[in-house]
A protein has these predicted regions:
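Short linear motifs embedded in intrinsically disordered, charge-biased segments
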Residues: 134, 161-205
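Catalytic palm subdomain of template-directed nucleic-acid polymerases
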Residues: 23-48, 69, 103, 160
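A glycine-rich phosphate-binding loop feature that marks nucleotide/adenosyl-phosphate handling sites
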Residues: 22, 58-70, 139-140, 165-168, ...
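Hydrophobic packing residues in well-ordered alpha-helices of helical domains and bundles
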Residues: 16, 36-39, 43, 57, ...
Length: 205
C-alpha cells in the first residue's frame, strides 16, 4: 500500500491517510465542482494503481463525504471503477464517526451509548455485599471504559466547551465512580474522583 503515495507526487490538492488496509483520500478544491473533478481524476488513478498491483477497491464499501460551509443542493457524482459512490453525511473511520459539519455529535452520542452499555455490564458483576472488588472495578474502568470514552478526543475536544456534551460524557464517569465505590447518587462526584485518583473528563481529554 505504501507505493500508493507515488501516484500523485504533487500533493497540493490531495492527501492520503493509510492504516493497514484502510485508505482515506482528502481532496481540496477552490470550489465544489473543482473538488469533485479532482476527486474523480484521483479515483481513476487509484483504480489504475490497484489493477497494476493485482488489487481492487470495493465501490460499495467506499463512501464519499462533502465538507462545505454552504448547502449544496446537487451532489455531483463520484465514480470508482465505473460504479457511482454514495454521498454520506456521516462516516465511521477507524472507530470514529465523522460528520460532514465536523460537529462530532454523532461520535459523542455513539461513544456515550457504547460506554453506557459497558457500565451496565459492570453492574452485573458487583453488589452491595458480593462481587468484584473496588480495585478491580476501578481497573476495568481505567482500562476499558475510559480509553473508549476519550478515543479521538484530540479531534473533538473543542466540543466539550458545550455544556451539553460535557455533561453527557461526565455522566458516564460519574456512574462508574459511584458503582466502583458503591456509594449513593447524592455523594459529591468531585470527592469520589479524588478518592479514585480520577480527573474530570474536561481535564483528561
Amino acid at each position: 500500500m505504501n507505493t500508493i503515495f507515488n501516484i500523485n507526487p504533487n500533493k497540493k490538492h490531495i492527501e492520503y491517510y493509510i492504516y493497514a488496509d484502510d485508505l482515506a483520500v482528502i481532496v481540496k478544491g477552490e470550489d465544489y465542482r473543482s473538488a469533485v473533478r479532482i476527486a474523480n481524476f484521483e479515483l481513476r488513478k487509484l483504480n489504475n494503481w490497484a489493477k497494476g498491483h493485482s488489487f481492487s477497491f470495493s465501490a460499495h464499501k467506499t463512501k464519499a463525504m462533502l465538507f462545505f460551509r454552504k448547502t449544496v443542493p446537487l451532489r455531483l457524482p463520484l465514480f470508482l471503477n465505473g460504479e457511482k459512490l454514495e454521498w454520506e453525511t456521516e462516516i465511521k473511520y477507524l472507530g470514529a464517526i465523522i460528520d460532514n459539519k465536523l460537529k462530532w455529535k454523532p461520535h459523542l452520542d455513539y461513544i456515550y451509548k457504547k460506554c453506557l452499555g459497558t457500565i451496565f455490564q459492570m453492574q452485573k458483576i458487583v453488589g452491595a455485599t458480593w462481587g468484584t472488588s473496588p480495585k478491580v472495578m476501578n481497573m476495568i474502568y481505567n482500562c476499558i471504559v475510559k480509553p473508549a470514552l476519550l478515543y479521538g478526543s484530540v479531534a473533538w475536544i473543542k466540543c466539550l466547551n458545550k455544556v451539553t456534551y460535557l455533561r453527557k460524557l461526565q455522566k458516564i464517569q460519574s456512574q462508574a465512580c459511584r458503582l466502583i465505590l458503591g456509594v449513593q447518587k447524592s455523594t459529591p462526584i468531585a470527592a469520589i474522583e479524588v478518592i479514585l485518583n480520577l480527573r474530570p473528563l474536561h481535564l483528561e481529554a
